[in-house]
Amino acid sequence: MAVPKQKKSKSKSRFKKKNFLLKNKIIAKNQYNNYFIKHRCLV
């Protein structure tokens, strides 16, 4: 019973990590877009 439990937690953590990376990518993209828009407004 302990082995499937370990597997489950492992896949869950992997999914969390994937989600976290995806979120970071989106945030980075938004920050870049915001900077680009501000820069364009200044120029």
Curated annotation (Swiss-Prot):
InterPro entries: Ribosomal_bL32. GO terms for biological process: translation. The keyword Ribosomal protein applies. GO terms for cellular component: large ribosomal subunit. Signal peptide: none annotated. The keyword Ion transport does not apply. Keywords: Ribonucleoprotein, Ribosomal protein. GO terms for molecular function: structural constituent of ribosome. Belongs to the bacterial ribosomal protein bL32 family. NCBIfam families: rpmF_bact (TIGR01031). This is Large ribosomal subunit protein bL32. It comes from Carsonella ruddii (strain PV). The gene is rpmF.
